[in-house]
Amino acid sequence: MIPVLLVTICLAVFPFQGSSIILESGNINDYEIVYPKKVAVLPTGAMNSAHPCCDPVTCQPKQGEHCISGPCCRNCKFLNSGTICKKTMLDGLNDYCTGVTSDCPRNPYKGKEDD
């Protein structure tokens, strides 16, 4: 009887005890799913199962779709290779989509001080 009572009290007083993690993205507004030895960042709004690109069970792109979000993702598909994803004002060394990822890779010809 005593152990059951203690468990009941603990659950009533501390119902949501758990370990804390620091988000890999550093942004407290991002959602992240944590798997053993892997952290997958979810885009804002991905927790909403109505997201058109996201499988609500796995939070991965639906079958036949390439991506959920990102600068090189539109309508659940990767943008074509060579599409400008970050335009620069001064030097003309824009960043371009690769056609195989939703990320916007940095132009390899830019110097360290350029951005």
Curated annotation (Swiss-Prot):
GO terms for molecular function: toxin activity. Residues 1-20 form the signal peptide. InterPro entries: Disintegrin_CS (IPR018358), Disintegrin_dom (IPR001762), Disintegrin_dom_sf (IPR036436). Disulfide bonds join 53-76, 67-73, 72-97, 85-104. SUPFAM superfamilies: Blood coagulation inhibitor (disintegrin). Keywords: Cell adhesion impairing toxin, Disulfide bond, Hemostasis impairing toxin, Platelet aggregation inhibiting toxin, Secreted, Signal, Toxin. Expressed by the venom gland. A motif (Cell attachment site) lies at residues 89-91. Residues 26-112 form the Disintegrin domain. SMART domains: DISIN. GO terms for cellular component: extracellular region. Poor inhibitor of platelet aggregation. The disintegrin inhibits the adhesion of the alpha-4/beta-1 (ITGA4/ITGB1) integrin to VCAM-1. Inhibition on alpha-IIb/beta-3 (ITGA2B/ITGB3) is low. Belongs to the disintegrin family. Dimeric disintegrin subfamily. Negative results: does not show inhibition of inhibition on alpha-1/beta-1 (ITGA1/ITGB1), alpha-2/beta-1 (ITGA2/ITGB1) and alpha-6/beta-1 (ITGA6/ITGB1). This is Disintegrin EO5A. It comes from Echis ocellatus.
